[in-house]
């Protein structure tokens, strides 16, 4: 890449970054937080944060990259995607009418809410316990990170339930919403994330998500400022780099350490070059249609229920890894959101996907606002826990693609909804047995005086 080519790419990158950052800043000033703000920051991180890192790798370490015209296509496709997404998100689908009291779809009380977070936490802890009994601490047993996807590791399906510890702790926080509950959320979820990091063998997702939710709650409540958020972001990047070194068993120093930091940070937070590799092989792609979305559900179907279930699922990430890159190392390489749309239907699917994503984020913000307006604090805690708990799925959406997001968000909704139903059933059983006694002001006063 020549300096002239780099200069042209830099101008496009700067314009796209300023365009997205400006719209995000205006939205932040208006509402402080919503899921449009979160997705916009996530989109910036995924498709634009990596450009400066790639530039340093090219000019400082002479690392090879895709041709400049391909990198230009990546930047332009990301900028156009966001423009279509933003217009879709801001488009009002129906006229605003005065709030009319409606019969709520469901209600929650104190016992049901506490039962819900206990069940969610129980699912996570039991799953971790069973996985640990089968495999021990994989971080200290395996020689390479790719081995966690091999047949040596049993009970891999249990990892999908680990994440429900975070929604459980979110319910606990939203029931109190003070600084102590906020700090308790951070300590408990990060400790759990470190435990799963050691047990699973290097998976950092739970730590990243817990830290991100902690920061966004702090921004919403005004407990941290923007400069503190930026400082925490830098600390998070350094922390993720250190965990990556431990995961891959690397011991580096000097120029090698700087080089390793650049490419690991780029691959962790901004896999934009993966989209460049995909576009570079555009003519070799056999468009998959909506099949990757259907196939991604296969992993949630037990083999005893479907004996003939394919052992290898050809979703967009695996198609990109196996068919496009001819990489059979055992690791699936993230195609990114735009890349998954290209695998499914080529360039035509990019604006269509942007419209779909705009509607998805609009729906989550509708739920979030519903929780903000809810007068029942227990129902509000459940709604907010569900919305913030889905942040992991939004990260999957930006990094892995639309197909991975759809299957995971459906799984999340089913499990979360099942926990709600079980909590309500248990409450009904306890109440029928006479074990539930409603609190009264007189009984509370007696307890205080006693």
Curated annotation (Swiss-Prot):
Q: Which GO terms describe its cellular component?
A: plasma membrane
Indicate yes or no for the key word rRNA-binding. Answer: no
Keyword list (alphabetical) reads: Cell inner membrane, Cell membrane, Membrane, Transmembrane, Transmembrane helix
The portions of this protein that span the membrane are 6-26, 37-57, 63-83, 118-138, 155-175, 181-201, 207-227, 228-248, 341-361, 378-398, 410-430
Coarse class of the protein's main subcellular location: membrane
Tell me, which GO biological process terms does this entry list?
A: enterobacterial common antigen biosynthetic process
Name the InterPro entries on file.
WzyE (IPR010691)
Please indicate which superkingdom the organism of origin belongs to: Bacteria
As for membrane topology, the entry says:
Multi-pass membrane protein
Q: In which pathway does it act?
A: Bacterial outer membrane biogenesis; enterobacterial common antigen biosynthesis
Name where it's found. Answer: Cell inner membrane
Task: Note the subunit structure.
Answer: Probably part of a complex composed of WzxE, WzyE and WzzE.
Question: Can you tell me which family this protein belongs to?
Answer: Belongs to the WzyE family.
Described by its record, this protein's role is as follows: Probably involved in the polymerization of enterobacterial common antigen (ECA) trisaccharide repeat units.
What name is this protein filed under?
A: Probable ECA polymerase
Organism this protein belongs to: Shigella flexneri
